[in-house]
Amino acid sequence: MANNTISLRSLLEKEKLNGINFLDWFRNLRIVLKQERKEYVIEEAVPNDPGPNAPRADKDKFKKHMDDMLDVGCLMLATMTPELQKQHEDMVAYEMIQNLKEIYEGQA
């Protein structure tokens, strides 16, 4: 499984997001995240913290989302040009995608 992950991530690593290539980069990102079962992180807003008295299952689900969100956000930043990294470094993965879609999704 690790070899599959590495080879799929190479899709993103071969050409960093520079703005012009958003549609291709986004397609490749979705392929990688789907294989890693983390695609939900760019599709769902950050959940509310369930709090200390919440059931264990809710806490575990929240922790998994936060951990996956961190992994995906770092992957996204690592596959962007330095200028785009600076613009997005204080955002979580979901916010990055929403912002990038606003800017670039009109590309044809």
Q: Model features per residue range: what roles?
A:
Residues 1-108:
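N-terminal Lys/Arg-enriched interaction segments
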